[in-house]
């Protein structure tokens, strides 16, 4: 097992790596950022320099991988574990840890909705304090991945093991429109019947229950997140933010404000087909 502390010394050549689209940064810029960031690579051989390609959805990315248009896909550890436990046709090529440059899960709002954002912040802080956040992580992330592993279901990553989430209804209460991509099971998932399931939905249901809000869910592609907010078609969007050391952030366009983060990833898998 090789540990490489970056800026890493890469072997000659490049590897085409797919990932779900980031906002406010190009694939070329992201490739440069990764090459010059501080991270740890664990693999059997010297890594080649990754060249990143963005896709508007997870399904498009996997199709590109299966078609040979890219060599690998990059996914967070929890998503990768779920995907691997459900699919024998893929394997881990390398593991990348970015302790100083974590990716954060939060909620995105139009900057005009500062009050709504602050109410979410308060609820998230309370959930961290009273243990609810840890409980939901155990049920919807660790618990789901364990169930998938034990069943050893070999199928598409859209699996029935993800626990459905129920949203309470409040008569006469305001309704918020929340956009979800469904691109990161068991974190973010849209079932075939259109219902939101997984960890993000569970977090949202808990917050909405505490705030007395009704929720209408909208299924979108990752690249449409900012436009959904700016157009007013959505009040809230599940957000995946890369916070770099020193406070520099990308994937946060002008006019978008983010809530207190409620989860973070600092370990990622590069997955490739077994054949």
Predicted region positions:
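Periplasmic-binding protein-like
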Residues: 85-121, 144-155, 182-183, 252-255, ...
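Extracytoplasmic/periplasmic mature domains of Sec-exported, cell-envelope-associated bacterial proteins
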Residues: 230, 250-252
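Sec-exported extracytoplasmic/periplasmic mature domains
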Residues: 66-70, 85, 125-132, 138-145, ...
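Ligand-binding clefts/hinges and TM-proximal coupling segments of bilobed small-molecule sensing domains
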Residues: 39-42, 46-47, 124-166
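Boundary at the C-terminal end of the N-terminal hydrophobic targeting segment
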Residues: 9-13, 150-151
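Extracytoplasmic small-molecule ligand-binding "clamshell" domains
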Residues: 13-76, 116, 120, 163-245
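Sec-dependent signal peptide recognition
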Residues: 1-2
């Amino acid at each position: 097992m090789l540990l490489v502390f970056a800026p890493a010394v890469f072997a000659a050549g490049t590897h085409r790596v797919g990932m779900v689209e980031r906002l406010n940064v190009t694939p070329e810029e992201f490739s440069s950022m990764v090459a010059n960031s501080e991270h740890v690579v664990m693999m059997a051989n010297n890594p080649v320099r990754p060249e990143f390609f963005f896709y508007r959805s997870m399904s498009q990315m996997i199709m590109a991988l299966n078609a040979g248009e890219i060599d690998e896909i990059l996914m967070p550890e929890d998503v990768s574990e779920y995907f691997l436990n459900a699919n024998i046709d893929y394997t881990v090529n390398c593991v990348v840890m970015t302790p100083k440059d974590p990716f954060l899960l939060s909620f995105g709002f139009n900057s005009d909705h500062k009050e709504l954002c602050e109410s979410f912040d308060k609820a998230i802080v309370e959930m961290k304090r009273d243990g609810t956040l840890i409980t939901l992580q155990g049920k919807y992330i660790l618990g789901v991945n364990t169930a998938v592993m034990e069943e050893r279901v070999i199928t598409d990553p859209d699996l029935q093991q993800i626990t459905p989430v129920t949203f309470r209804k409040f008569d006469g209460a305001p309704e918020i429109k929340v956009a979800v991509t469904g691109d990161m099971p068991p974190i973010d998932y849209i079932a075939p019947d259109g219902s939101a399931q997984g960890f993000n939905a569970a977090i949202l249901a808990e917050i909405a229950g505490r705030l007395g809000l009704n929720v209408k869910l909208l299924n979108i592609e990752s690249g449409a997140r900012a436009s959904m907010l700016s157009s007013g078609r959505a009040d809230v969007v599940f957000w995946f933010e890369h916070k770099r050391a020193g406070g520099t952030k990308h994937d946060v366009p002008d006019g978008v404000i983010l809530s207190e983060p409620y989860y973070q990833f600092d370990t990622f898998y590069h997955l490739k087909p077994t054949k």
